[in-house]
């Protein structure tokens, strides 16, 4: 047990890497990329207008399937597990909440800043070259979903240190309080619809809190029957709420803005993660699985941010050619989906090679030495303003450029660049252990 944690009465430190969480994240990321490849379908209408259809989401049979495949809550559960462990390790070394937020912000926004800058430059050039503005808008919208997810994830991680403190004092009361806020917003959203977007914070912070509980589950030691009962109960309650007409049965509809149904899915998925942990551990312990998951984990944010813009770009460019465009939902359209997925993966490879290093964990040093907390807060504002604007008003080319400038400003304010990792002990001779090396960042970082 780490002495600082023993003195503080905290739980023992967890291992730097949990292969089950790595595997869960890999599964989630793969499912997101595959799912989006099956959904996006740009349509060129006879009158010349261009729209984007969600062909898969419009299928009635897909509604019950998405109850299982809506894995966004699992992302936040995993983020809560690793985030809490990372924060406790940092705090034990004397790190502050602002230092934690600084590192989290930087790792997330650095690859996003490059994405926005590249998209703005490329699309502006295409517009000047005479490409139809409708096609430009279709391509611009490709960054919309990554931005809303980034805003929600950053909000949850930004609040993690103080939510972890509340969790340490009263874990169940903290979860109950966040759940009450979610329900209150859901009740008031019919009266004042913009209030619904408060659940972008409340829902995902509550799901993240489930990750805290899972991280400390060794103390609770729930049995397999209890975990199975939690899964059944949460899904039964979810089904009842849908049956009563209080919520849509389509989890894609419930995603933006999120509501109580996503929290209930998070409860079920957190319980499933623990219930199937022994089997998942055996799979994750296979050498080839471990290598694959570890490799993908290093570039997970790059893959997540870029896959949808690349898919939108590929689809939009095809509209400018005479390449056959089968109608969405037809047999020819379905047969073409595997080819679309292969093309997206092929496009991701050079992107990862060029920009994947931006996810490298910043070199640890004394927490915020000479850097006031105001700089971190200003960087957070610079990131959240364009992201929230995109959530409310949609992403336009102008907002894309403004977002790129704001994200670049945030990176400058945080004042770090990717450099080779040098252990803290080697530089200062301090007795405190260094933070995990970059290969572990897939697990201890978001």
Positions of predicted regions on the chain:
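Alpha-helical transmembrane segments and their immediate juxtamembrane cytosolic regions
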Residues: 2-434, 438-446
